[in-house]
């Protein structure tokens, strides 16, 4: 009989577990500490629980931590890990080390419904949403976990399309009984879904990054079908109702395509669209994917685009590209094993 995973449980849920097993009330906090702070590899290591209570716990539960089943290493130090989340489902997480920080790009779904033209994950179609356990396992089972400084929800899937489980995972990441991370260390990236965006802003203090890619609705809808359901102009109007001037950061992601969205008219329209918002723009280099007739703009074009926006008061950066040689860069998260499973 399958056992229930403890990883991904809130303190309230752990209190229900200990109550049902006849354990003392304080045992829930002890279990949470072992799970999220002390990084145990088995229930037997929870030594401040009595042997009897450990045996009771083991009878119905396990840690719910599963090591990656495969990995690929880039020449730039980036590592892509493959996690098996069920018999036929796989997701990837990408570890990105830098001089003074180490970031993990985490997945929220197997595949994605959004079908953005430039994204390999969307070409897979949608298979399943991850549980909080499966989201947090990408962190808990990471070999470099102790080096992590930041987490970005920018992997496979649309986080706002799996908001209950994503919010639960973020709560555990930031709760004092959980990992105890500052929300400033976590960024969620989204195409922007009407039903989820407002709830995320109001229930989480983590940074928010919106996939923009064109300031013109008709063109954005060609690149990102989600535009047809919730336009970027409506989204900006909603975002203006919230204060992003303090510790929380609002960013807009902008992949620069050669001859598509890289001219001065686009920069001017971006300034017009985002006027009045306390935000920044991250320019991203496009990496070619099979069957997509888009090409990345050159660095000179991207630099000019950045300088124009910044000189007109919109702080803009060019994001460093990492892991291209192992298909780990933005829009390239697509697993051969998942595609193989979908065919079977």
From Swiss-Prot:
Needed co-factor(s): [4Fe-4S] cluster
GO annotation terms (biological process): rRNA base methylation; tRNA methylation
Binding-site positions, S-adenosyl-L-methionine: 157-158, 189, 211-213, 287
Subcellular location: Cytoplasm
Cofactor note: Binds 1 [4Fe-4S] cluster. The cluster is coordinated with 3 cysteines and an exchangeable S-adenosyl-L-methionine.
Residues of the Radical SAM core domain: 98-325
InterPro entries xrefs: Aldolase_TIM (IPR013785), Methyltransferase_A (IPR040072), RlmN_N (IPR048641), RNA_MTrfase_RlmN (IPR027492), rRNA_lsu_MTrfase_RlmN/Cfr (IPR004383), rSAM (IPR007197)
Keywords assigned: 4Fe-4S, Cytoplasm, Disulfide bond, Iron, Iron-sulfur, Metal-binding, Methyltransferase, rRNA processing, S-adenosyl-L-methionine, Transferase, tRNA processing
Residues at the catalytic site: 92 (proton acceptor), 330 (s-methylcysteine intermediate)
Amino acids binding [4Fe-4S] cluster: 112, 116, 119
Enzyme class: transferase
Assigned GO CC terms: cytoplasm
Iron keyword on record: yes
GO MF, any single term: 4 iron, 4 sulfur cluster binding
Known EC number: 2.1.1.192
Catalytic reaction equation(s): adenosine(2503) in 23S rRNA + 2 reduced [2Fe-2S]-[ferredoxin] + 2 S-adenosyl-L-methionine = 2-methyladenosine(2503) in 23S rRNA + 5'-deoxyadenosine + L-methionine + 2 oxidized [2Fe-2S]-[ferredoxin] + S-adenosyl-L-homocysteine; adenosine(37) in tRNA + 2 reduced [2Fe-2S]-[ferredoxin] + 2 S-adenosyl-L-methionine = 2-methyladenosine(37) in tRNA + 5'-deoxyadenosine + L-methionine + 2 oxidized [2Fe-2S]-[ferredoxin] + S-adenosyl-L-homocysteine
SUPFAM superfamilies with a match to the protein in the record: Radical SAM enzymes (SSF102114)
Keyword Transmembrane helix: no
Any one Pfam family match given in the protein's UniProt record, by short name: RlmN_N
The family this protein is said to belong to: Belongs to the radical SAM superfamily. RlmN family.
Function statement: Specifically methylates position 2 of adenine 2503 in 23S rRNA and position 2 of adenine 37 in tRNAs.
The protein, known as: Probable dual-specificity RNA methyltransferase RlmN
């Amino acid at each position: 009989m399958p056992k229930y995973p403890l990883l991904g449980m809130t303190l309230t849920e752990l209190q229900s577990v200990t109550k049902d097993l006849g354990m003392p009330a304080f045992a829930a906090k002890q279990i949470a500490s072992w799970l999220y702070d002390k990084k145990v590899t088995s229930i037997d290591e929870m030594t401040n629980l009595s042997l009897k209570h450990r045996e009771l716990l083991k009878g119905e539960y396990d840690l719910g931590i599963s090591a990656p089943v495969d990995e690929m290493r880039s020449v730039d130090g980036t590592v892509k890990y493959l996690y098996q989340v069920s018999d036929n489902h796989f997701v990837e997480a990408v570890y990105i080390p830098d001089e003074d920080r180490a970031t993990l790009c985490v997945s929220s779904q197997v595949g994605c419904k959004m079908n953005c033209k430039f994204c390999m994950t969307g070409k897979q179609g949608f298979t399943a949403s991850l549980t909080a356990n499966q989201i947090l396992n990408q962190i808990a089972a990471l070999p470099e976990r102790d080096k992590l400084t930041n987490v970005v929800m920018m992997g496979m899937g649309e986080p706002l399309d799996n908001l209950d489980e994503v919010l639960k995972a973020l709560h555990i990441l930031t709760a004092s009984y959980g990992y105890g991370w500052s929300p400033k260390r976590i960024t969620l990236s989204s195409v922007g879904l009407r039903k989820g965006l407002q709830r995320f802003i109001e229930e989480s203090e983590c940074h928010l990054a919106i996939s923009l890619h064109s300031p013109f609705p008709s063109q954005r809808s060609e690149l990102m079908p989600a535009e047809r359901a919730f336009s970027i102009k409506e989204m900006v109007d909603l975002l203006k109702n919230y204060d992003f001037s303090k510790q929380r950061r609002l960013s807009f992601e902008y992949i620069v395509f050669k001859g598509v969205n890289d001219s001065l008219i686009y920069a001017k329209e971006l300034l017009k669209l985002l006027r009045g918002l306390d935000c920044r723009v991250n320019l991203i280099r496009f990496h070619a994917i099979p069957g997509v007739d888009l090409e990345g703009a050159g660095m000179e074009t991207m630099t000019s685009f950045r300088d124009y926006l910044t000189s007109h008061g919109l702080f803009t950066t060019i994001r460093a590209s990492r892991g291209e040689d192992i298909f780990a860069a933005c829009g390239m998260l697509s697993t051969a094993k998942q595609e193989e499973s979908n065919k079977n």
